[in-house]
A protein has these predicted regions:
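Bacterial N-terminal signal peptides
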Residues: 8-21
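Surface-exposed, charged secondary-structure patches
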Residues: 90-133
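N-terminal secretory signal peptides that target proteins for export/translocation
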Residues: 1-5
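A solvent-exposed, acidic/Ser-Thr-rich amphipathic alpha-helical stretch
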Residues: 63-107
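Hydrophobic pocket/interface hotspot
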Residues: 54, 65-66, 84, 116, ...
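Short beta-strand edge/turn micro-motifs at domain boundaries
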Residues: 26-38, 115, 134-159
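Short, low-complexity N-terminal intrinsically disordered segments enriched in polar/charged residues
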Residues: 24-60, 68, 77, 103-105
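A mature extracytoplasmic/lumenal domain signature
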Residues: 70-73, 80, 106, 113, ...
Length: 159
């Protein structure tokens, strides 16, 4: 489901922490050449803090709080910050409770950008039914973040 995938990637790429497990991999998968250089530990910690806050805001269903982690210039294919805003509104209308668990598998830096590879899952309790349902899970998916005014924000692939 496109709606949930974008929101999950939003939370995954920029936040690391509340329910995240420790950094899983320091080396790329065998045979896979990843862009950039290994990310310094200080930057990993900054990304973890940003992720923790984004997850907290997502689970609180705080649209503005989640979107504060997305660059105004965000673009991945046709997906923009405005589209993410609409997707959040749909999710917040469908579910009365949301949970996200995200682990940053690896992060690579290239200039002011960080390629963040994450694994995670999102579940929600359907409004009016009270039923918990898995919404999305992903493994080692990339997202691009960049530092804007001293804060890490999702930036997208800019295609």
């Amino acid at each position: 489901m496109v709606v949930t995938f974008a929101v999950v990637k939003l939370v995954a790429a920029l936040s690391l922490g509340l329910f995240a497990t420790p950094l899983a991999a320091d080396a790329p998968q065998a045979g896979k050449v990843l862009p950039g250089d290994p990310t310094p530990r200080k930057v990993i910690l900054e990304l973890q803090q940003a992720l923790a806050h984004a997850i907290e805001r997502f689970q609180a269903m705080d649209e503005a709080g989640v979107l504060s982690h997305v660059s105004d210039h965000y673009r991945t294919d046709p997906l923009t910050k405005a589209a993410i805003r609409e997707q959040l509104r749909v999710m917040f209308a469908l579910y009365d409770t949301l949970r996200a668990q995200v682990r940053i598998d690896e992060a690579r830096t290239a200039g002011e950008q960080a390629w963040v590879y994450s694994t995670g899952e999102v579940s929600g309790r359907l409004r009016w039914f009270g039923t918990w349902t898995p919404i999305l899970s992903w493994q080692h998916e990339p997202e691009v973040a960049r530092r804007e005014q001293g804060v890490w924000r999702l930036y997208g692939y800019q295609q």
